[in-house]
Design a protein with these regions (language model features):
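Surface loops and adjacent helix of pleckstrin homology
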Residues: 20, 48, 60, 87, ...
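Short, internal acidic amphipathic alpha-helical interface segments
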Residues: 55-90
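Short, well-structured hydrophobic secondary-structure segments
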Residues: 29, 33-69
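Intrinsic, low-complexity N-terminal interaction/targeting segments
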Residues: 25-33, 74, 82-107
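Intrinsically disordered, low-complexity regulatory segments enriched in Ser/Thr/Pro
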Residues: 38, 45-47, 94-116
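Short, highly charged low-complexity linear segments
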Residues: 13-22, 75, 93-97, 115-127
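Charged, alpha-helix-forming regions
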Residues: 1-41, 48, 121-123, 132-139
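Mixed-charge, glycine-accented linear interaction segment located at domain edges/termini
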Residues: 104-139
Length: 139
């Protein structure tokens, strides 16, 4: 099982998931540090999730459904501190709008970035996500 999962894009933004030191058990509960590097602004949040496998499923479904998918595929953390919305065009480009939100005592912070991915990279991204989140694909 991998300790980090990184998506790098040719055009800029980088999204990184890392296991937090108090990570419990993959598949049941997980604490992660999620970092969005979108120069010149970078930000990180601690994300706790009861069902971390759902993030791997999001990337796996994206790798299967990019062609012909209508509309936007969306996933959101329980507390809304991480939101990802994926859409595709007819040329095989997948745009994943990513939002990191932190609310510290009423001081709301938001960092956004759009990762533009090539369809050919999606299977590799899905495999990396499966390894990080401990998800066993049915494929």
């Amino acid at each position: 099982m991998a300790n980090e999962f990184i998506i790098k894009t040719p055009s800029g933004p980088i999204l990184k998931f890392e296991k937090h030191s108090d990570f419990i058990d993959v598949g049941r509960w997980g604490n992660f540090i999620v970092t969005l590097q979108n120069a010149p602004v970078n930000g990180s949040i601690k994300l706790s999730d009861l069902e971390p496998n759902r993030w791997a499923i999001f990337f796996e479904e994206m790798s299967k459904e990019w062609r012909g998918r209508q509309g936007t595929k969306r996933i959101e953390s329980i507390e809304g501190d991480l939101i990802m919305q994926a859409s595709s065009d007819s040329l095989g480009h997948i745009s994943v709008r990513t939002e990191l939100r932190a609310d510290q005592g009423g001081a709301d912070s938001l960092i956004t970035g759009t990762l533009v991915l090539e369809a050919g990279a999606l299977e590799s991204i899905a495999k990396s996500a499966n390894s990080f989140f401990g998800y066993k694909s049915i494929r």
